[in-house]
Amino acid sequence: MKKLFVLEGPDCSGKSTLARALQKKTNGVIFHASGNKLLWPVMHEYHQSIIDNAFAVLEHHDVIIDRLWLSELVYHRVLRPHLERRYQWELLDAQIRGKQGLYIACYPDPGIYARYEKNIDPSHPYDMETFKRICTGYLIELMTMHPRNDRFEYSVNFYNNSVDLAVKQILTLW
C-alpha cells in the first residue's frame, strides 16, 4: 500500500525541506498547496482538487502534500476574517483519514523568524507582525483543536532535529 503524508506548519518551519527529503527516500510525488490571493474565494475547491489528484497518484506512488486544511484554518483567521468561511476542513480530513494519511506537524522553532526575514516567499509577503500571528495561530490550533494530537501522528521541530532523522522516524511509523 502506498503512503500518504500531509505536512502542516507555517512558512519556514521545514515543510518543503521535509517534503523533498521524503520524496527522495520514497520516490513519492509532492503536491504543494499555495495560498495565492486569487484562490481565496475557492480555497475548498482548490484543496479538493489537490486531494483528488493526490489520490489518483496514490494508486502508484507515495504522496506528500505540503500543507492543506490546517493551514487554511490559520491563514483564514489571520488574513481574511472578513471573508465568509466556506471551507469544510472536516470533509477534507475525513478523505485523508480514509486513505490512512499520516499528518505531520512542523512546529515553529526559535529560528523561524530569522529564516522568514531571510527567505520571504513572494507569494506570502507578510510583515513580521502578521507572520508572528500566523505562527501563534498554528500553535493555538495544534494545542487546542488537537490537544491529544489525535490527528497529527508525528510532530517535528527542526531546531533540534535533522531532516534525515525526522524522515527515518516518520518512515518507521509505517
Regions found by a protein language model. Name each.
Residues 120-174:
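NTP-dependent small-molecule kinase module
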Residues 65-67, 85-117:
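Conserved phosphate-donor/acceptor-positioning beta-strand/loop module used by diverse small-molecule
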Residues 4, 68, 116-122, 126:
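Class I (Rossmann-like) S-adenosyl-L-methionine-dependent methyltransferase catalytic domain
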Residues 7:
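Hydrophobic anchor at the beta1->P-loop junction of P-loop NTPases
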Residues 2-4, 62-64:
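Residue-level preference for the first positions of well-ordered beta-strands
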Residues 10-13, 17-62, 74:
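Conserved substrate/cofactor phosphate-moiety recognition/catalytic segment
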Residues 73-91:
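A mobile, often basic/glycine-rich helix-loop segment
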Residues 10-13, 69-71, 108-111, 163:
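Short, solvent-exposed loop/turn segments at secondary-structure junctions
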